[in-house]
Structures are given as structure tokens and as C-alpha cells.
Amino acid sequence: MNVTVRFLRPFARCLVPYTFHRKRSHLYSGVLQRYMSSKAPSLSCHNKDSASPPEQLELDGWKATMKSSIQEDGVSEVSDKDEDSLASTRELIEMWRLLGKEVPEHITEEDLKTLMECASKSAKKKYLRYLYGKEKAKKAKQVKKEMKAEAREEAKRARLLETTAEEQQQDFMFLRLWDRQINIALGWKGVQAMQFGQPLVFDMAYDNYMKPSELQNTVSQLLESEGWNRRNVDPFHIYFCNLKIDSAYHRELVKRYREKWDKLLLTATEKSPVDLFPKDSIIYLTADSPNVMTTFKHDKIYIIGSFVDKNTQTGTSLAKAKRLNIATECLPLDKYLQWEIGNKNLTLDQMIRILLCLKNTGNWEEALKFVPRRKHTGYLEVSEQSQELVRKLKKTKTLNSFRKGSLNVRTWKR
């Protein structure tokens, strides 16, 4: 008994906080157990004369051990908390599925993390309903695709049965162009555009103004715009400016393009357009601009804001252009079209198709065919009286351009 009391005496100072703080007993008990297992003396019984004095407790070592254990326990608690929240979210989804609510059958880790970030229960239900609708649309599209493929195969088999052996052995003077050859030719045009083509900038600095669904819609329009530009006769040199690494835009683009992202024939940079080009050669295209675009300028650099705005936040791109002290222009929609309903904001793929047509032809009527017909009722028709007035003005201007007493003036008076 004497040996036991003598052994516990050095730890009396450590046992006092243990008795007062019962809530953290698991932490201090683990620390004491670790420290006692490493520092405790042997309990062998000796004679009173040969008994050595007990070892003194090293407070500095005990404090260091306790701090390290607190840090380890904190990290483990954070990881356990994340795992518990993921597990609870999966259980919640499974419970809602059993209750018959609109919940997707398969959900990715990224969608699961986005679901965990939802603040309220109603927000989680809305996001799960959105994923459910997206999954159903994907399945319906896949079924329709399979049905079309089966119909094509049946039509092909029927056509082969109807054709004779002589018709099957026909020779043609034209070589067949395979997809690989077409892609190589389009790639060469893209390389030439990067070296000598006119730049066209997509401003990617609007990811904070959009919801996740709006950002995904914007990236879809960017993919379609890049495809239209790549297949054009004289493509632009596309710039993705203000594209931050690991931003929402960058993650979504890499997710869509996958391994082709590093092979795209375009320039993606974190710099602003004013850092790459002189300000006097930049024109920011925005529907809120008071300046109407009259002709396409081949020596200018046009900027399009990558911004899908369903909440009608008007003036966002115009305010940014004013802050950067950049010239702005808008398309002459009211001059050529009988505008019916809706705002004058166009999608990114519609804008690039209009600009490509203007660049190649310079004809506004041909370029504005890409404006959706649901927004206007047709082109403005100039009346005969207006045409007669224009002709008179042209004649008057031509008459005044000659000197007095010239032959042309006398002939005109006669």
C-alpha cells in the first residue's frame, strides 16, 4: 500500500483538473494513460532501505503531449464530422426516395457536396427536384436516340434489300471525306486564326452574378459558340479572359471538354482584356449601350460578356465597361427588326453567329436572321414614299456637289 501511495503522489496535481472537468474526461484520460504508459516506473516491491525516491513529473513534456493529442483529436473530429454529414445526407435522400418524392436514382459526389451546402430543407428539396428532372430528361434523350438509331438501321437494311448488285458496285469520282480529315482541316483553320485572325473576347468575370444552373447554361452556350467559330470559313481567334484557375467557370469547362480542354485552339488567360489589348481598339458589346453599331469594324476587338441573366440585372456589363473606360455598342435591332416582346439580350452562340456573318458578308439583313423569330415579327419594310424621299435627297445632294455654271447643272435645269 505504501508503494501505491508513493507512486500516485507525483500525479496528484494532474488528477485535480480531471476531477473538476468531467466534460473533457475522455481527452485527459487518454493523455494521462499515454503519459503513464511511457513514464510510469515499475511497481516492483523493494525493501524500505533500498527504496529509491520517486521520479518527478515533467510538466513541459506533459503539456506538449496534451497539445499534440488535442490537435490530432481536432483533425479526426473534423473528418468524422464530414463523413457523418455525408452519411446523413445519403440517408436523407434514401428516406425521401422511399417516401415517393422526386429524388434522383444516382447522385455524384459533387452534387452531394452542393446539396450539403444548401441552407434550408426547402432548398435541398428544390435542388433534388432539379437533379431528378435532369436525370429524367437524360433518360428520355437516350431512349429517343436508341429509337432513332434502330430506325436508321431498319431503313438501311430495307434499302440494301431493294438495291441490285449492279447499283451496289457504283463508282464515284469524288473521294469520301471522313470525320478525321474534316477535323484536321478545321484544326488548320483554327491555327491560322490564332496567328492571323481577328480576336474575339469572351469576358468570364461574371461567375459571381449567376446561379449554378445559369452558369451551366452559359458554359453550354460557350461550347456551342466555339463549335460555330471552328466550323466557319474565317474563324475568330477566341480569348477567354478573366478565367481564374479552379473557378466555377474553369471547373465546368474542364468537366465538359475533359481531355480536349488542353487541345483547344483558343487562348484562356486570367488577364483582363485591357491588359492584352489597347483600350482605343476595344468595343464592349452590350444591349444597354446607347451607341448603336452601324458597321462591323475589322480592326477592332469586340468583347462579349459571358453572362446568362434570368433575373434581368440590367446594366451590369455596361457598368463594367464604364469602369474600364471602354467604348460600348449595341446591335441595331430596332433599325432592322419589328421588335415584338422581350428584352434585347441574345445568347452567346447567337451573338457569335451574327458577328461571323457580318465579318464575312457585311449584310445586316443576312446577319440578323439568327435572332429568334419569337422576339420580332419580321424586317422593317421601307414605304414607297420614304424611298422617293431618299431618292430626292440623293439627287439634291448630287446637284449641290457641282460648281455653279457647270455643264451638269445647266443640263439638270433643262
From Swiss-Prot:
The gene is Trmt10c. Component of mitochondrial ribonuclease P, a complex composed of TRMT10C/MRPP1, HSD17B10/MRPP2 and PRORP/MRPP3. Interacts with HSD17B10/MRPP2; forming the MRPP1-MRPP2 subcomplex of the mitochondrial ribonuclease P complex. Interacts with GRSF1. It holds the Pfam family tRNA_m1G_MT. It is found in: Mitochondrion matrix, Mitochondrion nucleoid. It comes from Mus musculus. CDD domains: Trm10_MRRP1. It catalyses: adenosine(9) in tRNA + S-adenosyl-L-methionine = N(1)-methyladenosine(9) in tRNA + S-adenosyl-L-homocysteine + H(+); guanosine(9) in tRNA + S-adenosyl-L-methionine = N(1)-methylguanosine(9) in tRNA + S-adenosyl-L-homocysteine + H(+); an adenosine in mRNA + S-adenosyl-L-methionine = an N(1)-methyladenosine in mRNA + S-adenosyl-L-homocysteine + H(+). Residues 186-378 form the SAM-dependent MTase TRM10-type domain. Residues 1-35 form a transit peptide. The lineage of its organism: Eukaryota, Metazoa, Chordata, Craniata, Vertebrata. One of its GO terms (biological process) is mitochondrial tRNA 5'-end processing. Residues 133-171 form a coiled coil. Keywords: Coiled coil, Methyltransferase, Mitochondrion, Mitochondrion nucleoid, Phosphoprotein, S-adenosyl-L-methionine, Transferase, Transit peptide, tRNA processing. PANTHER family: TRNA (GUANINE-9-) METHYLTRANSFERASE, TRNA METHYLTRANSFERASE 10 HOMOLOG C. It is an enzyme of class 2 (transferase). Its EC number is 2.1.1.-, 2.1.1.218, 2.1.1.221. This is tRNA methyltransferase 10 homolog C. It comes from the Eukaryota. Mitochondrial tRNA N(1)-methyltransferase involved in mitochondrial tRNA maturation. Component of mitochondrial ribonuclease P, a complex composed of TRMT10C/MRPP1, HSD17B10/MRPP2 and PRORP/MRPP3, which cleaves tRNA molecules in their 5'-ends. Together with HSD17B10/MRPP2, forms a subcomplex of the mitochondrial ribonuclease P, named MRPP1-MRPP2 subcomplex, which displays functions that are independent of the ribonuclease P activity. One of its GO terms (molecular function) is identical protein binding.
